[in-house]
Structures are given as structure tokens and as C-alpha cells.
Curated annotation (Swiss-Prot):
The chain crosses the membrane at residues 24-44, 72-94, 107-127, 162-182, 209-229. A motif (Histidine box-1) lies at residues 127-131. Belongs to the sterol desaturase family. It is a multi-pass membrane protein. Its cofactor is Fe cation. Its main location: endoplasmic reticulum. This is Methylsterol monooxygenase 2-1. It is found in: Endoplasmic reticulum membrane.
Amino acid sequence: MDSLVESGWKYLVTHFSDFQLACIGSFILHESVFFLSGLPYIFLERTGFLSNYKIQTKSNTPEAQGKCIARLLLYHCCVNLPLMMASYPVFRFMGMESSFPLPSWKVVSAQILFYFIIEDFVFYWGHRILHTKWLYKNVHSVHHEYATPFGLTSEYAHPAEILFLGFATIVGPALTGPHLITLWLWMMLRVIETVEAHCGYHFPWSPSNFLPLYGGSLILMWESFAYSADFHDYHHRLLYTKSGNYSSTFVYMDWIFGTDKGYRKLKALKET
């Protein structure tokens, strides 16, 4: 496996410059992972396949789905790509490299765990700020246009929000100056995670069923509580008020600061 990865990476660094890999390569990888992981949920919603796992009974119209895709392509090309290009000198200054040797899996794993933790913390507070009345009305309400979210709506947002919350995603890598392959793996995992959180389905194989604190189970000495993709779906069904699930990946921040109380009460009522 290592030799396969090394061979593939050798081909990339031989045929492309650092700038091309870090900017154009990252953009192509992001678009590929994002749409390949998100488009299947449009198929599920349109066909009704696996509808017993759908969180809401309502579905989006093909027109609404098409609008989302068109806006995403526009913003990805006009906001995301320029942002990647503009941030390249910063990452290079902080130590990012693409040359050999490749980092060990221990280093990669430790860095990505750090990125998830710091991204979740920064995203939580940034997301709460976006739910203040003025910012919600003028910026964040764009993301909440889809009260019935599907995978691709995870990145459907106002350009200002893309820049604002995008900081949470890049702050970890900017601090550590990782190898580009680590940055790519982090980006892939983060994209898959946010698509899953907005997918509108909760399957038996959903990660939240198996990974503690990952939008899943919060187990304490005195209680346990099961979260799921339904937690963020609940967030989209409500207005800018305290609707919870401000975190991006984990659930402990919502629990610590009490922003999961409304969801927990709703779950308790449904179970009685």
C-alpha cells in the first residue's frame, strides 16, 4: 500500500508544480469528493429508494436541487478556487510541502485528529455568531433556504459565510504546515463528514452510530444520549433562534454550552 501511494505521489510531483498540486489539484479533488459523495442523495430523494431511512417526509423539487447545484458550481469556481490560490503563500510560509519523504501514518493521524478538534471548536463559535439576528438575516439564511437538507446543501452558503467559516477548516493546517497529502486527506474527510451531516438520512451504517461524540452517542457517567444526522436536520428545520448543533463534527460543544437542549427535549417527547 505504501509503495502504491509513493508511486502515485512520485508521478504527481514529477509532472506538476507545488502550486498546481496545492491549488488546482486540491480544487479538483474537492469537487470530485464533494459531488461523488453528495449526488447519490439526490438520486435517493428523487426515486424514493431507502425512503424508510429518510429523516423528513418532505422532499426537494428537481428545480430546487438544480438551483443548489448551479449556485455551488458558481461559488466553488468564483470563491473557493481563488481562496485556495490566495492561501497558498500562507501555507508555504507555514511549512507545507509536497516533496518526499511522505509523512508516517502516525503523524498524519495525529495531525488530522488535531484538525478535527480545532475546526469543531472554531466552527461552533463562528456558527453561533452567524445565528445572531443580523448575520442570520443577511448571511446565514442563505444556507438555511433548504429546510429539508440534502448532501449538497452542506456547502450551499453566502460567499461571506464561505470565507468566514472556511477559516475554521484551514486554521489547523495553517498552524502545523502539513504535507500536502495530509491536507488532501483532511479535506476529503471533512467534505465527506459535512455531506453526511446534511444528507437527510440516518442509516444503520451511519458513522454517528459507531463513533462516540461524532454527532452520535454522548455517554456520560450519569446518562447517555444518542444523536444522529437528525440533530443537524433539526437545526435546519428551525429559525435562527437557539436550535442547536452549531458544531461541525462532534456533539460535546453543544452539550457543554447547552445548545442541544431543544433537540433533547424534542427527542424525549417523541419517545414518551
